[in-house]
Amino acid sequence: MIFNRSVTYSNARLPYSKRSLYTKTRVLFFLKQKILSRVTTKMAIADLDKQPDSVSSVLKVFGILQALGEEREIGITELSQRVMMSKSTVYRFLQTMKSLGYVAQEGESEKYSLTLKLFELGAKALQNVDLIRSADIQMRELSALTRETIHLGALDEDSIVYIHKIDSMYNLRMYSRIGRRNPLHSTAIGKVLLAWRDREEVKEILSQVEFKRTTVHTIGSTEELLPQLDLVRQQGYGEDNEEQEEGLRCIAVPVFDRFGVVIAGLSISFPTIRFSEDNKHEYVAMLHTAARNISDQMGYHDYPF
């Protein structure tokens, strides 16, 4: 017998024998659902055990995170039962997630809960989606005006990451890809992302940077870079003058969020044979117009350039 949960059954109106049968049937139905759920979970765990160790560990972590997300706080015993893992395995994963800041344990309590770090990651992803959507039109207009490679880059720990790109219309052009990382110290976008940050924060970030020289023009130390960052902030744009790659020039400007924080750099990249110093300020003006429009859409209406 199959019960439709949208229908309300009045047990009190049935004769005693039928009420008893009805109750037993309902109990059997829900027991069946519970058993099926456990069987499905066991099958999933069995499949998980067949995975390579690295994949299996990742799946277990996400299983624990999902279970933690269903409760305000939960103990190891109950959590291990839910994810069908041993308590020692669950404890080991919890301690790792706790050290990374994704899980909290209140004092001496044996209860664990999720922190807001996952929310912060989601918020960053959402911000990047909004940023890319807002930037795309401006980047395409820049591409149409200059015919050169246009990049949007963001800070990720000690590097820049290209989060959007419009390719040059020329055959001779800068080759890159979305998701590619480049150094902070030798790129125009990197300098822009650092220039508007607090000096102590910049020093902390740069302490993790390996100042690798890729050309004779590459900046080789924090002491050499800091005065350049002051100039970048003063003039409103950063430059890569063959510092990352021989034969390549780049100009970048800042993009601000609604709080006035620089969240990205917008750039034009040129082969040196197509770059003219006489036209540099025209390119800077184009970039500022585009970055101002993007910043405005991100909620910042006081673009300084």
UniProtKB/Swiss-Prot annotation:
A Gene Ontology biological process term: negative regulation of DNA-templated transcription
Keyword terms, alphabetized: Cytoplasm, DNA-binding, Repressor, Transcription, Transcription regulation
GO molecular function annotations of the record: DNA binding; DNA-binding transcription factor activity
Recorded GO CC terms: cytoplasm
Chief localization: cytoplasm
The keyword Secreted appears for this protein: no
Top-rank taxon, per record: Bacteria
Described purpose of this protein according to its UniProt entry: Transcriptional repressor that negatively regulates the expression of genes involved in pectinolysis and in pectinase secretion. Controls genes involved in pectin catabolism, including the pectinase genes (pelA, pelB, pelC, pelE), genes involved in pectin catabolism (kdgT, ogl, kduI-kdgF) and the outT gene involved in pectinase secretion. Acts by binding directly to KdgR binding sites (KdgR-box) in the gene operator/promoter region.
The protein, known as: HTH-type transcriptional regulator KdgR
Pfam families listed in its UniProt record: HTH_IclR, IclR_C
